Design a protein with these regions (language model features):
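Conserved mixed alpha/beta catalytic, RNA-binding, or beta-rich assembly cores of soluble enzyme
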Residues: 2-45, 58-65, 105-113
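General N-terminal targeting signals
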Residues: 23-27, 70-74, 98
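Short, charge-patterned binding micro-sites
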Residues: 47-51
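Extended hydrophobic secondary-structure segments that form protein cores and membrane-embedded regions
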Residues: 53-57
Length: 114
């Protein structure tokens, strides 16, 4: 069935020490959903479990993201997570530890049918 996109949230997460792409991605998802309350779902006769939640994470090293761990940040719905090249890595002045920044797009959709 076709889906209706209901909301798009964006977030940013940072790992200041360690270049941990998963940690930064989880923080980005948390940032994206932190101020959202999706009470409208019930207006469509649906429950939060009926939602489809599609997450795209942008990081410099997408292969370093544990997508299963990131998916656990979402409390409801059928969740899919993909990691793509993006984000930002800020090198340390000393050439050592860098700051890793992840961006997240969280898209919530509902099935058009009943």
């Amino acid at each position: 069935m076709p889906r209706i996109r209901c909301i798009t949230e964006m977030g940013m997460g940072v790992d200041v020490h360690g270049r941990d792409a998963t940690k930064a991605a989880k923080r980005a998802v948390s940032d994206a959903i932190r101020h959202s309350s999706l009470g409208f779902v019930r207006l469509f006769g649906k429950t939060p479990q009926d939602m489809f939640v599609d997450v795209t994470i942008g990081v410099p090293n997408p292969e370093g993201v544990d997508t299963s761990a990131v998916a656990k940040e979402l409390p409801y719905g059928t969740v899919t997570v993909k990691a793509v090249k993006g984000g930002l890595e800020i090198p340390a002045e000393s050439g050592g530890d860098a700051i890793l920044i992840a961006n997240a797009a969280v898209i919530v959709s509902l099935d058009e049918g009943k």
